[in-house]
Amino acid sequence: MSEFAPICIYLVISLLVCLIPLGVPFLFASNGSTYPEKLSAYECGFDPFGDARSRFDIRFYLVSILFIIFDLEVTFFFPWAVSLNKIDLFGFWSMMVFLLILTIGFLYEWKKGALDWE
């Protein structure tokens, strides 16, 4: 059991670090009485408690998906660039094929007009 003691201590401390911030607001929170200013409209005229399910343009979704895809591409390039002097020709050309596939995908998105904001 002594070999598992550090793991158990780590788990207890991590649970406390997670649960204490969740429990502290219950100790210091007010009764739920709200001020009328909190329920009034903002300076811009929006109600603070409106419908959260408002419609948004699908182009925002497409741009975010493209950002995630090309951001993941960059995360693949960092380890490849660090180990470039240790990998052989196969590693180099496999990354070039990966880059070519992503470039073709990017050009396809561009040709279809997913990046045009009209």
From Swiss-Prot:
<keyword id="KW-0249">Electron transport</keyword>
<feature type="transmembrane region" description="Helical">
    <location>
        <begin position="9"/>
        <end position="29"/>
    </location>
</feature>
<keyword id="KW-0830">Ubiquinone</keyword>
<keyword id="KW-0813">Transport</keyword>
<dbReference type="GO" id="GO:0030964">
    <property type="term" value="C:NADH dehydrogenase complex"/>
</dbReference>
<dbReference type="InterPro" id="IPR000440">
    <property type="entry name" value="NADH_UbQ/plastoQ_OxRdtase_su3"/>
</dbReference>
<dbReference type="GO" id="GO:0031966">
    <property type="term" value="C:mitochondrial membrane"/>
</dbReference>
<feature type="transmembrane region" description="Helical">
    <location>
        <begin position="87"/>
        <end position="107"/>
    </location>
</feature>
<keyword id="KW-0679">Respiratory chain</keyword>
<dbReference type="Pfam" id="PF00507">
    <property type="entry name" value="Oxidored_q4"/>
</dbReference>
<keyword id="KW-0520">NAD</keyword>
<comment type="function">
    <text>Core subunit of the mitochondrial membrane respiratory chain NADH dehydrogenase (Complex I) that is believed to belong to the minimal assembly required for catalysis. Complex I functions in the transfer of electrons from NADH to the respiratory chain. The immediate electron acceptor for the enzyme is believed to be ubiquinone.</text>
</comment>
<dbReference type="GO" id="GO:0008137">
    <property type="term" value="F:NADH dehydrogenase (ubiquinone) activity"/>
</dbReference>
<dbReference type="InterPro" id="IPR023043">
    <property type="entry name" value="NAD(P)H_OxRDtase_bac/plastid"/>
</dbReference>
<keyword id="KW-0472">Membrane</keyword>
<feature type="transmembrane region" description="Helical">
    <location>
        <begin position="62"/>
        <end position="82"/>
    </location>
</feature>
<keyword id="KW-1278">Translocase</keyword>
<keyword id="KW-0812">Transmembrane</keyword>
<protein>
    <recommendedName>
        <fullName>NADH-ubiquinone oxidoreductase chain 3</fullName>
        <ecNumber>7.1.1.2</ecNumber>
    </recommendedName>
</protein>
<comment type="similarity">
    <text>Belongs to the complex I subunit 3 family.</text>
</comment>
<keyword id="KW-1133">Transmembrane helix</keyword>
<dbReference type="InterPro" id="IPR038430">
    <property type="entry name" value="NDAH_ubi_oxred_su3_sf"/>
</dbReference>
<keyword id="KW-0496">Mitochondrion</keyword>
